[in-house]
Structures are given as C-alpha cells and as structure tokens.
C-alpha cells in the first residue's frame, strides 16, 4: 500500500508519527581540510562539551579516528537540522545538539537547554543513526510528531 494519495500528495501525518526526516552524507576529507585550515577552533564551533572531550580523547589515540568522530557528529547535526526544518538558523546551532552514546553504545541526540523548549513544543522523540567508512560519513535522523496531550498517537 502506498503512502501517497491519489492526488499525488503525501497525506498529513498523525500525532506520534514521523514529523521530519533528515540525512547528511559528507566526505571525511572535507572535515580534514577544515581542521587543517582552522585547527581546534573548527571542532570547538561544531561540538558540544561532551562531544569535544570525546573528540580530543579519540584524536590523541588515533588522529584519523578523531576526524571520523568529528565528521559523524557534523553529519548528525546537519541531519537533525534538516529533520526539524530549520537548517542552521536560530534557535538551532551546532553546539545545541550533541550526539552521545547510550550505555550500550547506541547513538542518542541530547538537545541543549537553548533549543529544548523550542523542540519540545513541536516534536516528540528524535532518533539518530550514524556511520563512517574510510572516506565518507553519514547520519540519518527521524523526528517524531509530538503526541497528543491524552497520549493518543
């Protein structure tokens, strides 16, 4: 069964359904060039505090692994900004959302206080998947519609 109506338009989503999808794919070389050009200022502009600490730890152990970490976080932020429909404009900014890891290793989005009120008024849960290979990094984000006050989808 198709999700496209006879008129060709996608029907509106019900509360609790998908409200937004974002995807970003980038060449890791792009991040390497930005780091070479701007140094740590680039990472400090993009990463939140917990991400930045993890970036430095990974880069100390293996510089290439640090770059891949930064690339996946960059991609996740781009994908998230697309899923919420803002791009990189207020109240969205690079450091206001972090991709951290749950105890089992699953990536989770942590939305900073500066963005949380805006996000919580409009959306439900957000989900992220990230990956990297030798030359590419990618992230995919799905944002759920905010559930109805009575909890119905």
Curated annotation (Swiss-Prot):
Cofactors demanded by this protein: Mg(2+)
GO biological process assignments: fatty acid biosynthetic process
EC number: 2.7.8.7
Catalytic reaction(s) noted: apo-[ACP] + CoA = holo-[ACP] + adenosine 3',5'-bisphosphate + H(+)
Location relative to the cell: Cytoplasm
Binding-site residues for Mg(2+), renumbered to this chain: 24, 78
Disulphide bonds in the chain: none
Major location (coarse): cytoplasm
GO molecular function: holo-[acyl-carrier-protein] synthase activity; magnesium ion binding
GO CC terms: cytoplasm
Main EC class the enzyme belongs to: transferase
Coiled coil ranges: none
Keywords per UniProt: Cytoplasm, Fatty acid biosynthesis, Fatty acid metabolism, Lipid biosynthesis, Lipid metabolism, Magnesium, Metal-binding, Transferase
Family of the protein in this entry: Belongs to the P-Pant transferase superfamily. AcpS family.
Function (record text): Transfers the 4'-phosphopantetheine moiety from coenzyme A to a Ser of acyl-carrier-protein.
Protein name: Holo-[acyl-carrier-protein] synthase
Originating gene: acpS
């Amino acid at each position: 069964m198709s999700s496209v109506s006879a008129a060709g338009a996608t029907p509106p989503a019900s509360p609790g359904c998908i409200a937004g999808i974002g995807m970003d794919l980038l060449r890791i070389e792009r991040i390497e060039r930005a780091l070479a050009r701007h140094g740590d200022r680039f990472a400090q502009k993009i990463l939140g505090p917990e991400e930045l600490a993890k970036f430095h730890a990974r880069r100390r152990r293996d510089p290439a692994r640090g770059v891949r970490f930064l690339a996946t976080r960059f991609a996740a932020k781009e994908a998230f900004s697309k899923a919420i429909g803002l791009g990189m404009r207020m109240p969205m900014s690079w450091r206001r959302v972090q991709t951290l890891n749950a105890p089992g290793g699953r990536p989770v989005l942590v939305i900073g206080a500066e963005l949380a009120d805006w996000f919580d008024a409009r959306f439900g849960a957000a989900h992220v998947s990230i990956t990297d290979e030798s030359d590419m990094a990618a992230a995919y984000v799905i944002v759920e519609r905010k559930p109805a006050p009575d909890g119905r989808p």
